[in-house]
Amino acid sequence: MTKDEMIQYVSARFSTEAEYPWADENFIFRHQGNRKWFAVAMRVAYQKLGIARDGLADIVDVKCGPLLMDTYRRLPGILPGYHMNKDNWITILLDGSADDELIKELFEISFDITNRRPTAAKKQPE
């Protein structure tokens, strides 16, 4: 899946548009209700990802949760979360190395995990 294909898929599937909060080409997808991010897309040097290759990679970080992390990180095109908490986020290379159906599955997981509303803090007795 390419970056453009990913944008089209996420926009159609989750009824949201890419937001550009920084003065560059990086962008996020977030929930309209709770405003939480469920994906961050970036262009970074392959070498910053630990890949011995010149050039830039289009990537997207999605939230996965620690219980599924090891399973997904073993698959082609999946890396520990770049620039995010590596216990909860994974990076997907958008260079064709990750299976398209896997990418869609990971977006579903990230969307569901981040769609939960935080519980209200318990009020301390006075």
Question: Where in the sequence are the language-model features?
Answer:
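Charge-dense, helix-prone N-terminal extensions
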Residues: 1-126
